[in-house]
């Protein structure tokens, strides 16, 4: 009996991808909801409490640097009559330094409150979406109700149209996980840099650092608002397995989710967390 090697190879490929995608699809949703919908809990853990409030924490370091700026200002003010250079009025400068020092001392609290406001807005939009679609707006719901979640079975055919759509869906989820994990880490880094971003406001020549920090931080946070609207649209689609257009529209919406940070970056500025974009930049370093 002659063995059909072509069919054996196809069956092996189908089995490998079926096992890979099913294992990822069943465990990925909890990570996505955690990394996408960020709230104040990201700031209020033990690590950030030590980083901001310890005896040699970020707030102490930033305030020490602020004191250095104050000494420099006093020296510059003293030398102003001899150099003829413009110096900010002492009352204005000291008032600004006092406000900045207070903000630096409460930088963890300010970040926590800002994220709490975003979390409240997120919950309001989720409730609005649930009223429209009748479904909880989350990636958990997306995976539990999707017909494109691949199960570990012999029915999966990677080379069929349905298999291609399911593969795009699974690859999209993998891309989402890496992109939003990068975003999650970047937000943590920006929170750690917040005291020094506030410090840059002490002079007009360095104030652009804070503006750049805030634009980047806000654009990364605003991504989750954009994602909610995309998920609402996704859950409102009536997917019919016999309608190719509705299926392609569904997969296209998943693609939009993977590019959400790029769209917000074009709108508000900031940095990209797109996995393909960062891999391309990394490869360009070695050219």
Where are these regions (language model features)?
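Alpha-helical transmembrane segments
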Residues: 198-215, 236-239, 266-267, 271
């Amino acid at each position: 009996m002659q063995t059909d090697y072509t069919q054996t190879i196809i069956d092996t490929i189908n089995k490998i991808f079926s096992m890979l995608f099913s294992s990822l699809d069943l465990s990925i949703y909890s990570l996505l909801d955690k990394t996408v919908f960020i709230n104040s809990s990201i700031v209020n853990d033990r690590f950030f409490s030590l980083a901001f409030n310890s005896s040699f924490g970020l707030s102490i370091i930033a305030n020490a640097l602020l004191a250095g700026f104050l000494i420099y200002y006093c020296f510059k003010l003293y030398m102003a009559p001899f150099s003829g250079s413009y110096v900010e009025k002492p009352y204005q400068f000291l008032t600004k330094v006092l406000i900045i020092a207070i903000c630096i001392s409460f930088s963890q609290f300010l970040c926590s409150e800002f994220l709490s406001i975003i979390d409240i807005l997120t919950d309001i939009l989720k409730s609005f979406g649930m009223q429209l679609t009748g479904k909880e707006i989350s990636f958990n719901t997306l995976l539990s109700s999707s017909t494109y979640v691949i199960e570990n079975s012999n029915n999966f055919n990677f080379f069929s149209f349905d298999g291609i759509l399911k593969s795009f869906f699974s690859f999209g989820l993998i891309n989402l996980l890496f992109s939003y994990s990068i975003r999650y880490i970047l937000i943590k880094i920006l929170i750690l840099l917040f005291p020094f971003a506030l410090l840059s406001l002490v002079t007009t020549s360095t104030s652009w650092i804070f503006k750049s920090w805030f634009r980047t931080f806000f654009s990364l946070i605003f991504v989750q608002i954009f994602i909610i609207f995309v998920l609402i649209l996704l859950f409102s689609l009536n997917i019919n397995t016999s309608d190719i257009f509705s299926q392609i529209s569904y997969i296209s919406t998943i693609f939009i989710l993977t590019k959400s940070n790029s769209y917000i970056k074009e709108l508000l500025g900031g940095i990209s967390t797109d996995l393909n974009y960062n891999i391309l930049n990394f490869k360009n370093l070695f050219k």
